Amino acid sequence: MSNNLLQRGKAIKLAVFDVDGVLTDGRLYFLEDGSEFKTFNTLDGQGIKMLMNAGVQTAIISGRKTPVVERRAKNLGIPHLFQGREDKLVVLDGLLEQLGLSYEQVAYLGDDLPDLPVIRRVGLGMAVANAADFVREHAHGVTRARGGEGAAREFCELILRAQGRLDAANAAYL
């Protein structure tokens, strides 16, 4: 982990996640009745909970809108959920104004072109390992894990490590 990423992670007060390809593996499953389902990784969920327990706020901004994402956000206690929004930078502008935060205090984890404006603007903009090449090239860092396979956990732990809180977050389970 680079010192640059750790330095950027120190100021983070809000962590924002895309869903498809980040909290999931990016596959879309459509059933005969027209419904869809997604799979989420429990390691990622625990990482998000650890981050929130350490006082870092969390949000989801997704280009697609599905009930399953609302259910997952509620399950994890993520207070800020925006779905069906491709204009992610506009959404984040409004959220930052509401929370009284600056872009330098935001970390974002994404995987594809709609995420790129946010990745390039925030204090810590990261891409998952299997993100589009162009997105990985413009991110501050890239996770070792793929989307839906522990990338969000890695991202959360990076922030906690940068802020000197990872050991305490882990010790809470001893």
Q: Where are the predicted features?
A:
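Short, basic/glycine-rich phosphate-binding loops at helix/coil junctions
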Residues: 24-30, 69-76
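Asp-based phosphoryl-transfer active-site loop
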Residues: 9-28, 119, 152
